[in-house]
């Protein structure tokens, strides 16, 4: 497969790998950590601009794409990358300690968020969706204060509970359609199940947005 075919996989995977690398960079080399975070978020923004122009995109192209970019996900991906770059640059002024952990978690959050918005498979969506609250918890607890720890635990409990609703909603979708591929779902709005699935996923989405 050529670069263009694998483009979506790189856009999701590179920030996650770069974030893992930041975790092992010594604190004395915080300039390297910051430079890496800036470069990755800048490249991510450029990549999502390209994705927005080239949409629709699929990866892998056959038989069932794991990632799909349409108009909505392209716009969401562009916004995620833009704000990741803004947060990264803004953080240079106030993050003094734990640079490796902070920017590592931030980059992994970027990759996981892009993975969630581009995911076509609902199982893949749940995986990326579940990683995000864990990273949020780790970012908040970097402040190492009692208040921060308590807030992080409350957010994690709320998100964890509502994520169970999302999984239940996805289970209902699978029961109705027999597939986890979103582009292959054709749902008739008959009976209670479609509306129950919608409400479960909607509540989980609002809970995650509120926590973030």
Predicted regions: what they are:
Residues 1-104, 176-188:
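Transmembrane helix-loop-helix hairpins at membrane boundaries of multipass inner-membrane proteins
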Residues 3, 72-74, 121-122, 154, ...:
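Short alpha-helical transmembrane interface motifs in multi-pass membrane proteins
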Residues 19-20, 82-85, 163-168, 205-212:
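Transmembrane alpha-helical segments of multi-pass membrane transport proteins and ion-pumping complexes
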Residues 20-24, 89-98, 137-147, 202, ...:
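Helix-loop junctions at the membrane interface of multi-pass solute transporters
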Residues 39, 57, 150-151, 155, ...:
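Short helix-boundary/re-entrant hairpin motifs in multi-pass inner-membrane proteins
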Residues 58-76, 122-133, 137, 205:
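Membrane-interface helix-loop-helix modules in multi-pass inner-membrane proteins
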Residues 102-108, 112-192, 207-209:
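Alpha-helical multi-pass transmembrane bundles of energy-transducing inner-membrane proteins
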